[in-house]
């Protein structure tokens, strides 16, 4: 695999699935602010003129789901009917039940350290030293493109932009190292009045060029900007949106494996979310410590059981110490029991809405992005 191409995509906060994710996590945050021990599994569906919020929530908190929903849609930028979706006039329906007591008895324990996993499942975490944030470059730059689209839309630089957008970046690799960008796709919703030529020029100058490193762009790099020629109808009017449908965008852009569980709308007792964050934390610290250039962690659980049923460390031949030693170091320095990882990463706080667009990983202010264990791991591994 000397030379190859690899592609990742991202979507903006105004993409229908991301609207749903953000509403689900906004509800979660509002509940955790009042009741950190709440059990939340909140799912959202959006379509033209309608939002349906459902799921299972057990809490002492009271939150106004309609207000949270409208505020979230408003912040994203859907504030007028000519966009096909309006925070002020859309219908908001709620169908919320309580978490099953059968699950509760497996999760809740008198001794918090024995808190069981909220479900069975397998989760992956990944890190690589090919970017400054120890994330794969394709997903990192795909995210940054749609973040930039939102920035120039909101600050008025390109006032004809609308909230829905998608990006895709194809990188060229040679012997595992980046040598350039082969192709860039950026599709953005826009108002009626902008013509295609002006849009393409503005997107190139204001979105693509400020984000993608010039040394990776060549005369052979292909650019596809709104390749259909028109993207006026977008957001929930163009497609329905559902929580949890962008799990590869949320993680590593396909560069690492995925256990299948979505994140948004789930409180930290759900290991689909919290253990995936912990696995990223472990992998990132291993790479930051210089123990490997690339690292993938798998962890798995049985419902109602505290100890993980398995922990795997994969370094793709880039390890600087024996793989068996890495596994022992992970078990020594990281508590991957559900309660342990919640405490380790301080997860019982309203920090989740911000994760719901532009990726859960690679943004330094999230607690699972800390590299505070790197030096300890390096010393324990016997590296200077």
UniProtKB/Swiss-Prot annotation:
ATP binds at residues 15, 164-166, 230-231, 239, 245-246, 262, 266. CDD domains: S-AdoMet_synt (cd18079). It comes from the Bacteria. GO terms for cellular component: cytoplasm. InterPro entries: ADOMET_SYNTHASE_CS, S-AdoMet_synt_C, S-AdoMet_synt_central, S-AdoMet_synt_N, S-AdoMet_synthetase, S-AdoMet_synthetase_sfam. Binds 2 divalent ions per subunit. Binds 1 potassium ion per subunit. The keyword Membrane does not apply. It catalyses: L-methionine + ATP + H2O = S-adenosyl-L-methionine + phosphate + diphosphate. Its main location: cytoplasm. K(+) binds at residue 43. It is an enzyme of class 2 (transferase). L-methionine binds at residues 56, 99, 239, 270. Homotetramer; dimer of dimers. This is S-adenosylmethionine synthase.
């Amino acid at each position: 695999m000397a030379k190859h191409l690899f592609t990742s995509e991202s979507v903006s906060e105004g993409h229908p699935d991301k609207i749903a994710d953000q509403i689900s996590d906004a509800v979660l945050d509002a509940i955790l602010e009042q009741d950190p021990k709440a059990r939340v599994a909140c799912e959202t569906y959006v379509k033209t003129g309608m939002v349906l919020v459902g799921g299972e929530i057990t809490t002492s908190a009271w939150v106004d789901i309609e207000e949270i929903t409208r505020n979230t849609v408003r912040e994203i930028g859907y504030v007028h009917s000519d966009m096909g979706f309006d925070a002020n006039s859309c219908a908001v329906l709620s169908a919320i039940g309580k978490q099953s007591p059968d699950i509760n008895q497996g999760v809740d324990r008198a001794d918090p350290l024995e808190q069981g996993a909220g479900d069975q499942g397998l989760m992956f975490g990944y890190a690589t030293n090919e970017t400054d944030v120890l994330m794969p470059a394709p997903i990192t730059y795909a995210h940054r493109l749609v973040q930039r689209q939102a920035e120039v839309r909101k600050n008025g630089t390109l006032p004809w932009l609308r909230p829905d957008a998608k990006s895709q970046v194809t990188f060229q690799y040679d012997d595992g190292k980046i040598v350039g960008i082969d192709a860039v796709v950026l599709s953005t919703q826009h108002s009626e009045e902008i013509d295609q030529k002006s849009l393409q020029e503005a997107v190139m100058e204001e979105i693509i060029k400020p984000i993608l490193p010039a040394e990776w762009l060549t005369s052979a790099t292909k650019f596809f900007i709104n390749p259909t020629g028109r993207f006026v109808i977008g957001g929930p009017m163009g497609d329905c949106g559902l929580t949890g449908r962008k799990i590869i965008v949320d993680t590593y852009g396909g560069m690492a494996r995925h256990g299948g569980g979505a994140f948004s709308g789930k409180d930290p007792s759900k290991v689909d979310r919290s253990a995936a964050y912990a696995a990223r934390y472990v992998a990132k610290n291993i790479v930051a410590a210089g123990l490997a250039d690339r690292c993938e962690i798998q962890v798995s659980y049985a419902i109602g059981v505290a100890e993980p049923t398995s922990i795997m460390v994969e370094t793709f031949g880039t390890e600087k110490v024996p793989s068996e030693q890495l596994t022992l170091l992970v078990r020594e320095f990281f508590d991957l029991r559900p309660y342990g990882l919640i405490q380790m990463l301080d997860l019982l706080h309203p920090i989740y809405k911000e994760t719901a667009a532009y990726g859960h990983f690679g943004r330094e202010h999230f607690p699972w992005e800390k590299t505070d264990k790197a030096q300890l791991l390096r010393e324990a591994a016997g590296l200077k």
